[in-house]
């Protein structure tokens, strides 16, 4: 039962072959037996209460596709009934007075919350080793990182601990862990998914999205996740659409752009081989490969690491120990309380980014760094628009290598940052991008570590991306493979 897709589980629920309560119990049991550290907060009584309500809804005949389907939320989305910690000591015991819009949308659809998922602290990281609550292990190889910052979200799907999870992507935090855990994830166009109740890291980049087993499942989840929200000033108002509408469209005549900058010196040979094999599969499906250039790709890392920390230093100034969250025990006056609270409450990586952000926003440096970065960001977006005159979608690797060993890059933040080279530019441009599994690494160690293929589309082209991904998943079985129990 735990290996079935959302679509399959939905059919079983609607025909009453299984109840939402039985399904929830099954996944709660699997979660309890797992040693991946993917889940942070679980409340079985609350989960079973939601499941019973879903069963009633199904019995009364007003259930939707997602009614009764279990889901787990990245601990960046605030929840009224579960703790919302953002993976930080700063919010260790925080319980929100309201639900994030994304959580609200899924509750209204009748989904059953299994709990909150581990992530890098305040979503800052590429390996899920920056969580105050400990690292998450990759289910394919427990000595490897799962990717980040949504490591718990991807690991829980790969280990079949939940059929659906929410995640957030600021510079690659949906796509990179999805790739390294061999599952499917999509970051929608910026503004598609409400950020209300999503603990902010970098407000002009943060975007929520789903991680699941298949592209079809991601489409079903997006149907509920995407909504206009007046409480989020960056929310985009568009007509409601069915993201699964084009899944079965043939790919004959599709033009796939292959950026030459994504296949350079930094890309490991086994990742390149898996990605090129996937591109060959697309040619068999009737697509044409087109050589394109995204010349500002290498500038995406310095640009991102000016803009994101600048916004983070501003966003995280609200955590001062006064109204909520952690407060230092011993202090002499207000100023001392602020200093000690933030010194003790934030982890090393978060403090590093706050310092960088404060520096680039400071007098005398703002023009030299922040303003320049915003100009380059615009040029990166223009590169993509130029490319889309030649092709329909863009494809390449998600990450330059398969997952590395836990602790391997712990002392080298820059090496961690470089893992996002292929995902950052999409985020800076605000474009939709997704990751689908397309193979494994090579050699004794890497042969069990997955590789992801990245598919990037133009603004609001999520249905197109899901179609392109779904057609590949109809022709291959990478998405069906699962780690040994």
Curated annotation (Swiss-Prot):
Question: Catalysed reaction per UniProt?
Answer: L-glutamyl-tRNA(Gln) + L-glutamine + ATP + H2O = L-glutaminyl-tRNA(Gln) + L-glutamate + ADP + phosphate + H(+)
- GO cellular component term, pick one: glutamyl-tRNA(Gln) amidotransferase complex
The enzyme's first-digit EC class, named in words, is ligase
Alphabetically sorted, this entry's keywords are: ATP-binding, Ligase, Nucleotide-binding, Protein biosynthesis
For this chain, one GO molecular function annotation is: ATP binding
Q: What is its EC number?
A: 6.3.5.7
Thylakoid found in the keyword field: no
The Gene Ontology biological process annotation of the record reads: translation
Domain of life assignment? Bacteria
Active site (UniProt): 74, 149, 173
Pfam families in the record, alphabetically?
Amidase (PF01425)
HAMAP family attached here? GatA
Assembly and interaction partners:
Heterotrimer of A, B and C subunits.
Described by its record, this protein's role is as follows: Allows the formation of correctly charged Gln-tRNA(Gln) through the transamidation of misacylated Glu-tRNA(Gln) in organisms which lack glutaminyl-tRNA synthetase. The reaction takes place in the presence of glutamine and ATP through an activated gamma-phospho-Glu-tRNA(Gln).
Entry's family note: Belongs to the amidase family. GatA subfamily.
Question: Which protein is depicted?
Answer: Glutamyl-tRNA(Gln) amidotransferase subunit A
């Amino acid at each position: 039962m735990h290996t079935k897709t959302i679509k399959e589980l939905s059919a079983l629920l609607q025909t009453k072959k299984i109840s939402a309560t039985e399904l929830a119990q099954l996944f709660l049991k699997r979660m309890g037996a797992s040693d991946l550290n993917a889940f942070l907060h679980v409340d079985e009584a609350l989960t079973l209460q939601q499941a019973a309500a879903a069963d009633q809804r199904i019995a009364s005949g007003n259930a939707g596709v997602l009614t009764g389907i279990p889901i787990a939320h990245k601990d960046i989305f605030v929840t009224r009934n579960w703790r919302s910690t953002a993976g930080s000591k700063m919010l260790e015991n925080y319980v929100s007075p309201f639900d994030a819009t994304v959580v609200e949308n899924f509750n209204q659809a009748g989904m059953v919350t299994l709990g909150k998922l581990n992530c890098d602290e305040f979503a800052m990281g590429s390996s899920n080793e920056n969580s105050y609550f400990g690292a998450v292990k990759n289910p394919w190889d427990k000595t490897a990182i799962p990717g980040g910052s949504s490591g718990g979200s991807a690991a829980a799907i790969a280990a079949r601990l939940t059929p659906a999870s929410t995640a957030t992507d600021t510079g690659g935090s949906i796509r990179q862990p999805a790739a390294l855990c061999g599952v499917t994830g999509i970051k929608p166009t910026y503004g598609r998914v409400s950020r209300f109740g999503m603990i902010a890291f970098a407000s002009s980049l943060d975007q929520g999205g789903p991680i699941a087993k298949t592209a079809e499942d991601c489409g079903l989840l997006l149907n509920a996740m995407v909504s206009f929200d007046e409480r989020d000033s960056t929310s985009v108002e568009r007509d409601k659409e069915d993201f699964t509408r084009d899944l079965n469209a043939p790919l004959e005549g599709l033009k796939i752009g292959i950026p030459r900058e994504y296949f350079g010196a930094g890309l490991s040979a086994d990742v390149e081989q898996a990605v090129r094999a996937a591109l060959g599969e697309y040619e068999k499906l009737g697509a044409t490969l087109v050589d394109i250039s995204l010349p500002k790709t290498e500038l995406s890392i310095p640009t991102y690491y000016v803009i994101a920390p600048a916004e983070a230093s501003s966003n995280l100034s609200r955590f001062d120990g006064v109204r909520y969250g952690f407060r230092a025990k011993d202090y002499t006056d207000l100023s001392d309380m602020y200093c000690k609270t933030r010194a003790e409450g934030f982890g090393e990586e978060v403090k590093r980014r706050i310092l960088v952000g404060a520096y680039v926003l400071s007098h005398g440096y703002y023009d030299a760094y922040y303003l320049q970065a915003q100009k380059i960001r615009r040029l990166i977006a223009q590169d993509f628009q130029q490319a889309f005159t030649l092709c329909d979608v863009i494809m390449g690797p998600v990450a330059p290598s398969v997952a590395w060993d836990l602790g391997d890059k712990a002392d080298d933040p820059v090496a961690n940052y470089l893992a996002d080279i292929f995902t950052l530019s999409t985020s800076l441009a605000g474009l939709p991008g997704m990751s689908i599994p397309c193979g494994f690494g090579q050699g004794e160690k890497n042969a069990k570590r997955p590789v992801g293929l990245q598919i990037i589309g133009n603004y609001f082209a999520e249905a197109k991306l899901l179609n392109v991904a779904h057609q590949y998943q109809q022709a291959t079985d990478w998405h069906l493979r699962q780690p040994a129990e």
